[in-house]
Amino acid sequence: MKRLAVLIVTAGLFLSNVSGALATPPSGVTTVSIGKARFVDDIHARVRTDVDPGTRTDFWQAVIDTKGASDLEVIQNTIAPGGSFGWHSHPGPSLVIVKSGTATFYLASDPTCTPHVVQQGQGFVDEGGDVHIVRNQGTVDLVTVVASLIPAGFARRIDEPNPGNCSF
């Protein structure tokens, strides 16, 4: 029995080291933290705004609901041409603004490796939990501003192995 326990622990350590070795770290990326705050209580924010007072059905709505303490971090990333964030995921949602350049992202769950292109002045939502990569396939720096809401104390980025669905 003792031998089986040692074997299980050894296998677990081996697998954890292999998964770390298979991770795809960022390249050509510089990140600056703009600010970080801990929200110790649940967040329940709901707003409904009448965007066309003459029409009873034109409302814009937003909901943020968390259970447990949360961290909100705002960062700015600069990605050199040819650089990428590497394959990764997040434990919570992020709102991403493309400040300059062009972001191209790919999802690990997409067997066709379809590029999703986001231009300067546009944004996108990373809902969290999905494995993806963001690349700068342009000729100028890509600058993004990201607001991430995650469980308190968690790392905002989780390195992931290359899923093998893209040729790069």
Language-model features, listed with the residues they occupy:
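A short, N-terminal "cap"/entry segment at the start of jelly-roll beta-barrel domains
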Residues: 4-7, 13-71, 115-117, 161-168
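Short acidic-glycine-tyrosine-enriched beta hairpin
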Residues: 79, 109-129
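Histidine-centered divalent metal-coordination motifs
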Residues: 88-90, 132
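Glycine- and acidic-residue-biased ligand/ion/polar-headgroup-sensing regions
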Residues: 90-111, 120
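Ligand-binding loop in jelly-roll beta-barrel domains
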Residues: 119, 128-155
